[in-house]
Curated annotation (Swiss-Prot):
Gene3D superfamilies: Collagenase (Catalytic Domain) (3.40.390.10), Glucose-regulated metallo-peptidase M90, N-terminal domain (1.10.472.150)
Species the sequence originates in: Escherichia coli (strain ATCC 8739 / DSM 1576 / NBRC 3972 / NCIMB 8545 / WDCM 00012 / Crooks)
The protein, known as: Mlc titration factor A
Function: Involved in the modulation of the activity of the glucose-phosphotransferase system (glucose-PTS). Interacts with the transcriptional repressor Mlc, preventing its interaction with DNA and leading to the modulation of expression of genes regulated by Mlc, including ptsG, which encodes the PTS system glucose-specific EIICB component.
Pfam short name (any one): Peptidase_M90
Family under the similarity heading: Belongs to the MtfA family.
Main localisation: cytoplasm
Subunit structure: Interacts with Mlc.
Keyword entries, A-Z: Aminopeptidase, Cytoplasm, Hydrolase, Metal-binding, Metalloprotease, Protease, Zinc
UniProt subcellular location: Cytoplasm
UniProt record, GO biological process: proteolysis
A Gene Ontology cellular-component term: cytosol
């Protein structure tokens, strides 16, 4: 179900959205009750402000809408929903989609090619996603399409183009750039050693700073146990920027699981 901004008051009294069910995905397991409540509040506002547009026969129901909204709002849980200003629509294909890509080489020749995309984020336009990869974003694997595209949106708030440096105090920019490029170099060294497919972190992170920030944002929220020990200095910068500590959440979730296991009779 799509909630339209001009129908908020009308629909709010008619349909109770399945937030409790929507929260029951591995990615959100470690959230406290207070964090869950805050996230749902943001997600409700997100659905009031943004238009979710299903394409090519994709069917969008209330549970899917809620989970999409929760994933959009997780990165801005402490930053605030205003950090997601600048776009009003989320276009959702049923599967990865084909786009016409145009690029210019080093000698000025323009090339055209058709490529398959999982998602796209335009600075002053919609975010484009696909449901197959959204579904794969519910677990804690290090892959999260929505967080990746949200990171690009957060990145561009700092200037005209994504640079890998989000909107942080000027005094912190040099340190951020140093740690981000060090991470890129480290990932590239691993790729050269074991190959892209065997690398422990998505090789796309080594392609440029903007993609490194987006990819590591995926790992920050969905695989903190891989990010934090490998890049501790950059991890602290991400914690400071997002004002969250997903590794602490992971430990809390694991402690809860251990306690439950020891009390099974």
């Amino acid at each position: 179900m799509i909630k339209w901004p001009w129908k908020v008051q009308e629909s709010a009294h008619q349909t109770a959205l399945p937030w409790q069910e929507a929260l029951s995905i591995p990615l959100l397991t470690g959230l406290t009750e207070q964090e869950q409540s805050k996230l749902v509040t943001l997600a409700e506002r997100f659905l009031q402000q943004k238009r979710l547009v299903p394409l090519q026969g994709f069917e969008l129901d209330s549970l899917r809408s809620c989970r999409i909204a929760l994933l959009f709002c997780l990165p801005v849980l402490e930053l605030g929903l205003e950090w997601l200003d600048g776009f009003h629509e989320v276009l959702i294909y049923p599967a990865p989609f084909v786009v016409d890509d145009e690029w210019e080489d080093d000698i000025g020749l323009v090339h055209n090619q058709r490529i398959v995309q999982s998602g796209q984020s335009w600075q002053q336009g919609p975010i484009v996603l696909n449901w197959l990869d959204i579904q794969d974003s519910f677990d804690a694997s290090g892959f999260n399409l929505i967080i990746h595209e949200v990171a690009h949106k957060l990145d561009t708030r700092n200037g005209d183009r994504a640079s890998g440096v989000p909107f942080i105090p000027l005094r912190e920019v040099a340190g951020w750039e140093h740690d981000l490029h060090a991470a890129m170099n480290n990932i590239q060294e691993e790729i050269e050693l074991v190959g892209e497919n065997a690398a422990s972190i998505d090789a796309y992170a080594a392609s440029d700073p903007a993609e490194c920030f987006a990819v590591l944002s995926e790992y920050f929220f969905s695989a903190p146990e891989l990010f934090a020990p490998r890049f501790p200095s950059l991890w602290q910068r991400f914690c400071q920027f997002y004002q969250q500590d997903p590794l602490q959440r992971l430990h809390r979730a694991n402690d809860t699981d251990s306690f439950s296991a020891t009390n099974v009779h």
